[in-house]
């Protein structure tokens, strides 16, 4: 048992001999230095380096020639942090051995990659901002030209009426008159005047003379019957049941004759329709100021507008 313990205790130096044979006892282990270098930059530190955004939503303000642009503390602080982190994290005892420099080579390459990426983004944002400043500076450097920018559409001095050519309205609204009766022949004056339809309830209710006759002589019932019995959508028999020019004239008149036996008020429709035509003609003759001649010549009569004279008493 003692021999095995001695042989077992003597086996440990034999196992450690090939592993520690090429290094002195006072030198540090390069693998320990590598594990220390791996933890130089953590994820929070990398995020802290790239947490600022130098891009702006609007155009940058052009600095005046008399004033110097203020330094950007965020950019300087960023570069200080980029260059300061690897320096503070380096242990001082690793600067005197080649083993430590070979172990630090891949780590420094990763740090330089991060710093070069941040520098490239900073360079891109700086170049974009400088190009915007050059564009804005060239536009604002003109001086009086920039002050004379037109912001409101200029108005023409001429009135719209002066640009229009002479038309019929320039000669006068009622310049064209009939040669026989001497009345105006414009469309407004020669249009026939219908009977008023809003003459009750202070012009709030529509009650035309035609509707009064239709409901008073029960023709509205005939129109409703023809409307429901008609198969053609384009058939206007319901609108003019007594018309002789439309289709199915004999059928309509026969149906109205049969219905007049039950509705004797239908016999009053034709006399009431004649009275309506007579009243319409009388009302139109009184209220229409234009010409009612069928065949007549048109004469243009323009009376020049002369300003009134001021008759002063002689002194």
From Swiss-Prot:
GO BP terms: animal organ development; negative regulation of epithelial to mesenchymal transition; negative regulation of ERK1 and ERK2 cascade; negative regulation of fibroblast growth factor receptor signaling pathway; negative regulation of lens fiber cell differentiation; negative regulation of protein ubiquitination; negative regulation of Ras protein signal transduction; negative regulation of transforming growth factor beta receptor signaling pathway
Region (Required for interaction with TESK1) location: 178-315
Site (Cleavage) residue list: 144-145
Domain of life: Eukaryota
GO terms for cellular component: cytosol; microtubule; ruffle membrane
Purpose of the protein: Antagonist of fibroblast growth factor (FGF) pathways via inhibition of FGF-mediated phosphorylation of ERK1/2. Thereby acts as an antagonist of FGF-induced lens retinal fiber differentiation, may inhibit limb bud outgrowth and may negatively modulate respiratory organogenesis. Inhibits TGFB-induced epithelial-to-mesenchymal transition in retinal lens epithelial cells. Inhibits CBL/C-CBL-mediated EGFR ubiquitination.
Domain comment (free text): The Cys-rich domain is responsible for the localization of the protein to the membrane ruffles.
Keyword Repressor: no
PANTHER family linked to this entry: PROTEIN SPROUTY HOMOLOG 2, SPROUTY
Ranges annotated as biased composition (Polar residues): 1-15
Name this polypeptide is given: Protein sprouty homolog 2
UniProt PTM: Cleaved at Pro-144 by the prolyl endopeptidase FAP (seprase) activity (in vitro).
Compartments where located: Cytoplasm, Cytoskeleton; Cell projection, Ruffle membrane
Location of region: Disordered: 1-140
Protein family according to the UniProt entry: Belongs to the sprouty family.
Domain SPR: 177-291
Bias (Low complexity) ranges: 108-140
Entry keywords, A to Z: Cell membrane, Cell projection, Cytoplasm, Cytoskeleton, Developmental protein, Membrane, Microtubule
Biased composition, class Basic and acidic residues, residue ranges: 20-32
Gene label: SPRY2
Coiled-coil annotated residue ranges, if any: none
Record's subunit section: Forms heterodimers with SPRY1. Forms a tripartite complex containing GAB1, METTL13 and SPRY2. Within the complex interacts with METTL13. Interacts with RAF1. Interacts (via C-terminus) with TESK1 (via C-terminus); the interaction disrupts SPRY2 interaction with GRB2, potentially via disruption of SPRY2 serine dephosphorylation. Interacts with PPP2R1A/PP2A-A and PPP2CA/PP2A-C; the interaction with PPP2CA/PP2A-C is inhibited by interaction with TESK1, possibly by vesicular sequestration of SPRY2.
Required for interaction with CAV1, as annotated region: 118-315
